[in-house]
Amino acid sequence: MNIRIYQIDMDKDTKSVKFENLEDTLNIAGQVNPAIYSQVYANVCDCNNLEDVFFKFNVEKPIDFTGHSLSVSDVVEILDGENKGAYFCDSLGFKKIDFDTSAACA
């Protein structure tokens, strides 16, 4: 599975939405703002679904992963396959969202 992971940069998080669930993020900020996110991983990983990604990036972190353990408010972008798109790590599972990756910091 070819993925990218984005995490909120605390220096850009003026509305304090890091680690907030999707509903609270939308209530506080009105959107999931890609401009406050930084890309912390981009590679092919040995995962079949988002639950595998969550496990891997909490228990078996790859050496090229520069972020914290995968948490609520992080965004996982799947770059290939039928589930291609951006997914918000929510309190329970993942939710597909609109996320302009070109606005996030690489």
Q: Where are the model-predicted features located?
A:
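Extended boundary segments
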Residues: 1-45
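Short, compact, well-ordered microdomains
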Residues: 66-103
